[in-house]
Design a protein with these regions (language model features):
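Short glycine-aspartate micro-motif
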Residues: 10-16, 69-73, 113, 137-141, ...
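Short glycine-rich anion-binding loops that position phosphate/pyrophosphate groups of nucleotides
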Residues: 20, 77-79, 143-145
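Glycine-rich phosphate-binding loop plus the immediately following alpha-helix
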Residues: 22, 114-118, 159
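Glycine-rich phosphate-binding loop and adjoining helix at the ATP-binding site
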Residues: 41-42, 46-53, 57, 67-72, ...
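Short glycine-rich, Thr/Ser-proximal phosphate-binding strand/loop in the N-terminal lobe
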Residues: 2-50, 54, 67, 85-87, ...
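A cytosolic small-molecule/anion-sensing beta-strand core signal
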Residues: 29, 76, 82, 152-153
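Glycine-rich phosphate-binding loop of actin/hexokinase-like ATP-binding domains
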Residues: 132-162
């Protein structure tokens, strides 16, 4: 896999766990796409964790030794609390109650951040996309299910689950 890593000093990995597909990306510090992997989302919490670790391993194995991997971000199609536990994910088989952040963080050597996929999409829009210079926005995600996030004064509004 040629990831176009010339002049890259830092990178991050993002993994989107959707109801039907799981997408892994590696981004440069400027937000440029360096690599992308896509797999069907497996049924079951153990299989989901194994897939996330496999994607992380493959993507992180592609970077040069002088490139600093800063973090792993995971977006989940469902309700996720502030500890990174999946509270309710109707389109992910047997994922409710999965402490995904805790399980993944114990296996990787970078900080792990887990959030609802719509919140992750909103963060991307605030930092790099259409909402970059806009204080307030509504982000709607469409996939196997439908989701949304509200941006107020440049910050993702957090509901009852954080």
């Amino acid at each position: 896999m040629d990831i176009g890593k010339a002049h890259v000093k830092a990178a991050s990995i993002g993994i989107d766990i959707g109801g039907t597909k799981t997408l892994g990306v590696m981004l440069s510090e400027q937000g440029n796409l360096l690599a992308q992997l896509r797999f069907p989302t497996p049924p079951g919490s153990v299989e989901i964790v194994e897939l996330v670790l496999s994607i992380y391993s493959e993507l992180s194995g592609e970077i040069d030794n002088d490139v600093q991997l800063s973090c792993l971000g995971i977006g989940v199609a469902g309700l996720v609390d502030t500890t990174g536990e999946i509270y309710h994910a109707p389109n992910l088989v047997n994922a409710d109650g999965l402490r995904i952040r805790e399980l993944i963080a114990s296996k990787v050597d970078v900080p792990v951040h887990v959030d609802n996929d719509a919140n992750c999409a909103a963060l991307a829009e605030i930092r790099l996309g259409a909402a970059k210079d806009i204080g307030n926005a509504l982000v709607v995600t469409l996939g196997t299910g439908i989701g949304g996030a509200v941006v107020v004064n440049g910050t993702v509004f957090r509901g009852g689950f954080g």
